Amino acid sequence: MLFRSLGTIERQFNGIKVVVDCANGAASYVAPEVLRRAGAEVIAISNEPNGRNINENCGSTHLDNLIAKVRTTGADLGLAHDGDADRVLAVDNEGNVIDGDHILGILADHTDIPTNTVVGTVMTNLGLIRSLESRKLTFVATPVGDRYVLEKMLAEDHMLGEIGRAHV
């Protein structure tokens, strides 16, 4: 499913330099590889898990290292996962933080969504919902919790959803 999803991205990452902070966790091997397969030049940081250093001053809860690396390397984008890789935040080339709602909006703009539906929760940002609707996408709200979003996505074959707090 993970690599199948790469085919839904309208634009490849060719010529884009991406710093990815893997939080010394589950994303340490997968995230850099997915980005490389998508064509990105990848700089991986905090990608050496040893069983004790997960989330240690790195990842989506500690963005300082990512922001610094993006700025010093001239990267176009930075991505930060948490230790279990169920959360991602981004920073732009200047180090400005891009939160989960913005990421979902960007993905909706650049992804073929077969069901034309995005799943979120009753707490999803109203601005995001209005933005999706202006693009003729349907927004479906579930109760708060990744379980409910995932259940809705699986039951109705939706490809894009988020529960907030950068869980996309």
Tell what function each PLM region has.
Residues F3-R165:
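Phosphate-binding chemistry for phosphorylated carbohydrates and sugar-nucleotides
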